Structures are given as C-alpha cells and as structure tokens.
Design a protein with these regions (language model features):
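A short, flexible helix-boundary coil/loop motif
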Residues: 2-40, 45-54, 175, 269-317, ...
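Short, positively charged, Gly/Tyr-enriched micro-motifs
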Residues: 42-102, 106, 229, 403, ...
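Electropositive, glycine- and tryptophan-enriched low-complexity nucleic-acid-binding patches
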Residues: 146-222, 340-341
Length: 445
C-alpha cells in the first residue's frame, strides 16, 4: 500500500490508499489550536512577570477564561483550573498583586506584529453596564457613540487590526469627576501612567481626553512602525482631537459629525471663500466628484458592497495660525439620493478616496469582532472595586482574545497557520504615498 507523509497545521498525516490517517494515531492530531495558541502567547508575553508562579497564574487565568462558559468571574475561572484553592491565588493575582500590566500589553502587540503585521489601530468604546456604586468609574452617563444614557463604566479599547487578526491590546477606563477614588485606598497604589491615574493623583479627564490618551499611550508604549489610527470622534472635540494626533505625529482617520465646521481650501470647488461651512454641506456641493468603490463587508463574511465616495481638501478653523492644517474631508454615500452616511477627516492626504474608504472599514471590522467576542472572553466581567484589578483582568482577557483569534486561524479549514508575511515598509507622517499607489499596510480591497 502506497503512503505519502505530509504535515499541516493539525499535525503530521499519512495519505494512505484508504484515506487520510494521522501519523502515530489520533493523539498526534492538534485538537485544541486555541489552547495551544494561548500557551504559546503566555510563554511569550508574560515574561515581564518576575516569578514563575506569577507566570503560571497568568497562564491559568487565560486558560480559565477560554474554558469558562458564561460569566468570566474569578470564581468561575478558578473552577476550570483548580477550584477553591485556585480561586484565592487567582484573586490575589488580579486584585491584590502589584505587577505592571503595560509590558504584557506591549509584548502582546509585538507578538502579533511578528505573526501578522499591523494595518491600523482602532479605538473602540466599550460600555460596561453595572448596578451599584462600588466599582471604580461607575456612573450614570450619556454615551455619545450610542446616543443614550446608561449606568455603568465606560472604557476605550485600542484594537490591533491586521489582515488576519482583530484584537484589543490597550485599555483606558473613563473616570468622571469625583469617581477617581471610588475604588478606595487601592486606587492610590502605584500604577502605570499609560493606563490610569498616577499614584495619588486626583485629575479629572474628559471623555475626549480619555479616548485620545488611551490611543496615544498604547502607541507610544509599543514603539512599532507608524500606522494610522481609526476612531470615531462624533460628539467630542474634532479640532482638539486632530491637533493632539498631529502633535504626536501619528496619522489619523477620524469619523466626524455631519455638522462639524470646516473651510474649503480648493479654489476650484463650491464653497471656497464662503467661510466656515458644515461638513455635510461641503460634501453635498461636490456630489459630482463621487466615484463608486467596492469594499468587503466584515459584518457579512464574503459579501461585497459598493459605496460612492468623494474627498475634498479642507481646513479646520483654529484661533492659532500654526494649527491651521489642511486635511481631507471624506464622504461616503450608501444611497446616492440621500446625505452622506459617514463623514471622516484625515491627514492621510496622499491616499486615494478609494483607499481611504476601505481604511474606514477597519472600524466596522472591529465593531463586528467586538460584538461577537467581547462577551466570550469576559472583557466586561470584572466585578472588583480597584482600577488596577480592572486593568489586570482586561489585560488577561485581551491575551485570551488574541489566542482565540490566532487559534481559530490555525484551526480553520484550509488554514495555513499564522506565519508572518513580509513586513511592510515604515509609513512616514503624513503618509507620503503617491496617488494611486496602495500602501502595503492597507486592508485588502
């Protein structure tokens, strides 16, 4: 009987005349790609934890998250990895320890970059409904992204997006006025400035500042090749947000409200010299410039959509002449007879309208991924009172989320694992890309 031996992501197989059989029997088949990805990740990203028992607690916590059905409380996680005895040690690991979560988040970003290079950072708000008053940051507030009131916590996740992976790697919790000390004395323990208040600091941070600082701190800590930031700034300060990213020399593509006030700077276009105009009116005046662009719909895998898109050079009015910069106003029409469905501003002025439209869909990819996976890894499930405990929990949950992404890519039918493709070139800021040339980091059309 003729046989041929081959290897794929499931292990080593022999192709017999009677069919496919694993070499060495069924035990050689990879039966848990997500678990294996989790072990590999933990080995790589938990190295900043000095003690071996801490690294083991971290691995147990990640594995427990992946194995737990329903709410990912410390008690439920412990039931998967050792019961009551494990519960006490895991509780101390998350809520009572002093390890720094930022090096783990940075290591996670670098691990992912080695596997599947970064396309863009996406800032995604995450509302965490909660009753009671004991958890840090809980309040009754208006969510500008959802357009409704809710009671609970408001966090911002900074998501790593690539052609293969969509996963959070950074977090910041919004702390309203008077809430900074809501977690009690533990809130004043030393914490990394990138992820919360400085030790003993009583500083109010606006919703806008929280969103932008979360992105900037994550990117600074990672020190990776420059990639665009995609975020939604409707309902928060358009001008101040864009200025902060410009000062950080970080390219940005920001969704804005239709009433945002801008100046047309192209003498050949309607609205030039007319003063400050609403963004929707500027775009309605240039409907003749619209072109059709096809894009993949991440909400419906395999589906392709077509939108009309136009881009106009504009300026954000600013009292300081030094801050008056030209940007592109990008409009998308899903219905050509109506007003633009989405409006964006960007300093990626060398990219084509088609490339910019497809880049905006990174936000749609993250929204689709978050709606399907945030609950699966318990990102909203921390029930403790301290800010540091919250950060440690969401850090471990982010590692679990990344393991699920990587493991699912390995276990997919016909999948070839997540071997690293060739690294794309560094992107300068502003993106120095000739019109018509598609940068290597852009998500495929």
């Amino acid at each position: 009987m003729n046989t041929t031996t081959r290897r794929d992501v499931r292990g080593e197989f022999q192709f017999h005349s009677t069919g496919l059989q694993p070499v060495g029997g069924p035990d050689r088949v990879r039966r848990d790609p997500v678990g294996e990805a989790a072990d590999d990740l933990c080995k790589a990203v938990l190295t900043s934890l000095r003690r071996r028992d801490q690294r083991e607690r971290g691995r147990q916590y990640v594995r427990g998250i992946l194995a737990t059905q329903g709410r990912k409380s410390i008690r439920n996680i412990a039931q998967q990895v050792g019961g009551p005895a494990a519960e006490q040690s895991l509780h101390h690991f998350i809520a009572g320890s002093t390890w720094d979560w930022q090096p783990i988040r940075t290591a996670l970003s670098h691990y992912l970059e080695e596997s599947t290079p970064l396309t863009a950072w996406v800032a995604q708000p995450m509302a965490i409904p909660k009753g009671g008053d004991h958890s840090v940051g809980v309040g009754h507030r208006f969510d500008p992204h959802q357009g409704q009131m809710f009671r609970g916590q408001q966090a911002f996740g900074i998501w790593f997006t690539s052609s293969e992976v969509i996963t959070p790697v950074g977090w910041r919790l919004f702390l309203p006025p008077g809430e900074e000390g809501a977690g009690g004395p533990s809130e004043r323990e030393p914490m990394p400035s990138a992820s919360g208040l400085e030790a003993g600091e009583e500083k109010y941070e606006s919703y806008e500042e929280c969103a932008v600082t979360g992105v900037l701190d994550t990117v600074r800590q990672c020190r990776m090749p420059s990639r665009p930031v995609v975020l939604d700034i409707r309902g928060i300060g358009t001008r101040s947000t864009m200025n902060r990213f410009a000062e950080a020399r970080l390219p940005v593509l920001a969704r804005i409200g239709s009433g945002a006030r801008l100046l047309v700077t192209d003498p050949a276009l309607p609205g030039y010299g007319a003063g400050v105009l609403a963004a929707r009116d500027i775009l309605q005046n240039v409907k003749g410039l619209r072109i059709p662009v096809e894009w993949r719909d991440p909400s419906h895998p395999g589906a392709r959509r077509t939108s009309l898109v136009a881009a106009v050079r504009v300026m954000m009015p600013d009292p300081s002449p030094a801050r008056r910069r030209q940007v592109l106003l990008v409009g998308e029409w899903t219905d050509p007879r109506r007003l633009p469905s989405q409006l964006w501003v960007t300093d990626l002025t060398r990219l084509t309208p088609a490339a910019l439209l497809r880049l905006t869909k990174q936000a749609r990819r993250v929204s689709a991924a978050a709606s399907a996976s945030v609950q699966e890894v318990g990102l909203r499930d921390f029930a403790g009172r301290s800010l540091s405990g919250w950060h440690r929990h969401v850090t471990m949950a982010s590692v679990a989320h990344a393991a699920r992404c990587l493991g699912d890519s390995v276990g997919a039918v016909g999948g070839g694992g997540y071997a690293r493709p060739s690294a794309p070139a560094r992107v300068p800021h502003p993106a120095n890309t000739s019109a018509g040339v598609r940068p290597a980091w852009l998500w495929p059309a």
